[in-house]
Amino acid sequence: MADPAAESIDASSSRFGRVVCYNQTAMHGSNTISAAAPFFMTQLSVANLTYRILYYFLKPLCLPPFVAQILCGLLFSPTVLGNNEVVLKLIFPYKYTMLLETFANLALVYNVFLLGLGLDLRMIKIKDIKPVIIAIVGLLAALLAGAGLYYLPSNGEADKILAGCMYWSIAFGCTNFPDLARILADLKLLRTDMGHTAMCAAVVTDLCTWILFIFGMAIFSKSGVRNEMLPYSLASTIAFVLLCYFVIQPGVAWIFNNTVEGGQVGDTHVWYTLAGVIICSLITEVCGVHSITGAFLFGLSIPHDHIIRKMIEEKLHDFLSGMLMPLFYIICGLRADIGYMNRTVSVGMMAVVTSASVMVKILSTMFCSIFLRIPLRDGLAIGALMNTKGTMALVILNAGRDTKALDVIMYTHLTLAFLVMSMVVQPLLAIAYKPKKKLIFYKNRTIQKHKGESELCVLTCVHVLPNVSGITNLLQLSNPTKKSPLNVFAIHLVELTGRTTASLLIMNDEAKPKANFADRVRAESDQIAEMFTALEVNNDGVMVQTITAVSPYATMDEDICLLAEDKQACFILLPYHKNMTSDGRLNEGNAVHAEINQNVMSHAPCSVGILVDRGMTTVRFESFMFQGETTKKEIAMLFLGGRDDREALAYAWRMVGQEMVQLTVVRFVPSQEALVSAGEAADEYEKDKHVDEESIYEFNFKTMNDPSVTYVEKVVKNGQETITAILELEDNNSYDLYIVGRGYQVETPVTSGLTDWNSTPDLGIIGDTLISSNFTMQASVLVVQQYSSANRQTAENNNQEPVQGKAKTDHEATPFMEDEDDEVEHQYSMRR
């Protein structure tokens, strides 16, 4: 038998017989379920799926995303699913949590970088000292209360009490600005004085929290005890802050300005920027503070107005928030143990600490409101908003847990407290803060009541750039003069997405939009502003103020109506949700835009018009903009009777007086036979007949010597004869624009038999007929609805505060965020 000692050993094999030089990777292993990479992919999928499901079910409850984030983590805590055998073996085994934590921390670094990147302090200008006082007093009260509450659940380790108290107190006092802004946007409070004060106070609180957190990390070492290298750590941290401000910020700006050609930023710039995040994070880690500090400071160092900011946000935001950040929430949940805490801390003690956590900022803010002469209900609302927590609170807690300054009990207790605080903020605000709706009394809510030689205030809305040309040409046709000018408020409606903060930003030379729009949206906003400005420049009778309204589609109609009320508009002009294609037909359109139009028409504080643009953007109309073209513009007004038709007649009448406008008013009169067979429709017609006769008589009397006006009456028996008469009009004349009344849910003898065929409620019977495929004409159609208080929801009569006085309509208006602050009486606008 051969001597075992004499046996040769293969150098390519380990002592366990594994072939070292041919060791298979995790992706190609024979048992893939035990490899790290497949486990990580499983964890990533489970984390994302869980977060999305929780967020989907919590969103209707008006809870912020932070609640879903915490619940996502707690779901996999040891108390819930963390100790489940299947979860431990197949999803979150202990030996593969290191890779999970690595990617979670990397996601956190880049997420904090995006927070710094999106924090533009110029966005909110603090005019007075009120928000600063509220922020400082609230933060100090939270720090003191946090220090006291720290000793109630558990005393912690004796040598780490100071460090634990610091982390606990800072996390207790922080406020999350992005979630606070989202809550204000959902409740339509962004433009109120209370909302402005709360956002300013949140910004101050965030900055103070960052300063305290940075210095706290420098004071205590990684083991949770006093840092013996404190002087060097503080000096190096301060030096890095100064380096970012005086070297990195101007250096990055210089590099971008000298390497970016033609406004095009290449991927190389983005990759170098992302590498800079890692480098700065490493530097602050070496300095003795958390790595996220460097990422945050580097984000602040990127030039605010440079296109690189938007590119990085577009590339990172959705991927981080939707893919990688749920891993961080899972890590937070795995560190919490509710069952262990329940065995150590009584339920009563937990209730005391949680209740105190909620009340401390509310009480301190209400105390400040007494001395600052702010209504107590506003102080209650601001105090509730200051309790808004977010990712920063979890970051502070995890930093304390990493250093062992916070034990499992402390960590779990404060995590649950944050969950409760975030859950009660929005419901408490919605219940306790019910600001009275501003009801401005003004007479000219309709064009019919508008005096000819006074200013006509029109609120126009556009969704996309193609909507603009038709609307501007219609405004030009509206005969604006110095004696009867048009004051136009043009709104570009932009959907509020996950990475934008809702606000109304006035776009002029002094205040360009600073919200982080995508490049396409911002460029489109600039082009829209330029086109409306051109309308103003080329006509002395037009004043234009262009606004970008960023809000969710679900509440966009409320923004339009509130702004119309604020500006005392007497006419809202909306684009039809379908656009004309190259072959002259209307496309399928946008169903969401159609819903917005219908909601505006139901709740508008003034008259509304919907423009179906089918040719007003052509050359023949565009040449009219510069007053060098004298081609006649043929306009037809179809009068069937009713308040909407009288309003349409008033708008068409306003166009009279221009050399190039030829107006034809066609009144459809029911025959005696039609009145007999119409039944109830005839009764309704007779009620309005006297008022219709007066309007027609006044129009004919004042335009009888005007050769540009033609009045025609046609006697018809039913709706079918009305359609036939309209077809004959189109055969004998080529009209550029039809103006009709909506006449919604009103059947007259001249429209009998057409109601069942009305497929477009927002256009009415005649408007729907004019744009149908049965008509070969390509004329545009303006459908007008007259304001009627009876048509508005009766709920608007409740909880209203009458406000006398005229709203600001100056052309040189200031941003809404800088409106005058009335210390005597705070008046707010809010959707019910």
Curated annotation (Swiss-Prot):
Observed phenotype of the null mutant: Mutants display a reduced rosette width, a later flowering time and an altered leaf K(+) and Na(+) contents. No defect in male fertility, due to redundancy with CHX23. Chx21 and chx23 double mutants are male sterile.
Start and end residues of each stretch annotated as Disordered: 792-832
Keyword Transport among record annotations: yes
Residue stretches of biased makeup (Polar residues): 792-802
Expressed in which tissues: Specifically expressed in root endodermal cells. Expressed in seedlings, roots, leaves, flowers, flower buds and pollen.
UniProt xrefs under Gene3D superfamilies: 1.20.1530.20, 3.40.50.12370
Entry's localization field: Cell membrane
Transmembrane segments: 33-55, 61-81, 99-119, 132-152, 161-181, 200-220, 236-256, 278-298, 319-339, 352-372, 379-399, 413-433
Pfam family, one: CHX17_C
Molecular functions (GO terms): antiporter activity
Entry GO CC: plasma membrane
Membrane topology: Multi-pass membrane protein
Organism this protein belongs to: Arabidopsis thaliana (Mouse-ear cress)
Superkingdom field: Eukaryota
Main location as per UniProt: membrane
Family, similarity comment: Belongs to the monovalent cation:proton antiporter 2 (CPA2) transporter (TC 2.A.37) family. CHX (TC 2.A.37.4) subfamily.
Protein name: Cation/H(+) antiporter 21
Keywords for the protein's UniProt record, in alphabetical order: Antiport, Cell membrane, Ion transport, Membrane, Potassium, Potassium transport, Transmembrane, Transmembrane helix, Transport
Role: Operates as a Na(+)/H(+) antiporter that plays a role in regulation of xylem Na(+) concentration and, consequently, Na(+) accumulation in the leaf. Required for pollen tube guidance, but not for normal pollen development. May also be involved in the development or function of the female gametophyte.
PANTHER family: CATION/H + ANTIPORTER (PTHR32468), CATION_H(+) ANTIPORTER 21-RELATED (PTHR32468:SF74)
GO biological process, one term: potassium ion transport
